[in-house]
Amino acid sequence: EGEKAGTGRLRRESLELVTCCSDFLKDAYNPKAYLGNDLKEIKAGIKENFKNTSRFTLVEQPTTAKFLLEAIKLLDSNTEEKILISEDGLDTLVNMAIGSPGICFYRLLGNKDLAQEAATKFCNNIFNRRYNAAVIDILYNKKSVQTYFKQVIDYCVMGNLQAVLDEFAYMIDERSNGERNVEMIQKRMIESFIDRNYQEIDTTESFGKEKKKKWRIRTHYAMPYGNIRMTDQATNRANDVRLAFNSPFRPFVLASTSVGQEGLDFHWYCRKIMHWNISSNPQDMEQREGRIDRYKSLFVRRNVAKFHPETYTWNEMFDLARTEAKDKGFCELVPYWSIPQDMLKSIAETDREYIESIVPLYPLSMDYDRYRHMKSVLRLYRLTMGQPRQEELLESFKDMPAEDIDKLLFNLSPIKRKK
């Protein structure tokens, strides 16, 4: 019953299969060599290489996780024994080479024990939950315990799990592959596989009453951050949620307040912020956006990746982008903290990435006037701090006479030449 409901759908041989670390499958696919190729071409190339090894004999037989595990053990051994396998089984091995969790972690970490542990916790946390299993059932329009492991592997291939893990590892440790601390990377990744969270809610019958009958609901994809009663347990839980949110995995929505958020960063995998209310303090609004507008934030990385789609490693992409920024005369904050419009011109306008600040304004609400006033105050606040946004700076000058604008400018050059 539990398997059908989604819990424990990956178990025994199927879990061992998707988390196995095979040298043969790891070496069968080199992401850098296939960079820019169509997925169909990549699969065809790997499959052709498999057939050229003369290790396989195609037969008609069902593809089970137990059989594939035995085949992989033979492939990793020195024996030349022929492996009887079906066309479907060969396709599954191809998919495993590209995106199986065990192979992807092994390719990244280069250590079987670390990769096996990380992949097992990843699969148990992501794919052995009923709500995630339901997503895959809907996506593949099939609910079967026997073929669930194939769907999981294909799902990881379609989502390019290898690229996801590579980017996450880069954010944890920016050094080149040979210099990285793989133990630290593995530990930080495991910390992001957060368990289910429970949230107490009021019912319509108990709302506003002193004696409340509260219900506990599970929260998965959206979670609250922080707690009014910051006990040690609540503090630890808040830290776990923060680490999970700063990862490519759930939760994808974080509900928080402005209180006590100074110094906290949520920029690794977030570029949108929705303001539930409009603060009267411009510094408060600035600090809210500052949580996701920081060093190598998500919108920065996405733009840098679009500058050089032919480049494989993140270090190389940022080095090339920095060289371009230097040639254009930009300071060393570019492209790590921000990317000027002049550099974004090389990207199609519809593909450019920005920080998105969403303010819901309801009809006939006083928030309309309050928001207009706040934008005006924010422009002046940034001017005062010496960090204006170009579009806001131009907006403040739009209705001013030219002679008044000249009075606001001052010359910082060492020699002032009069006309």
How would you describe each model-predicted region?
Residues 1-254, 258-419:
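Helicase-associated low-complexity regulatory tails and linkers flanking the ATPase motor
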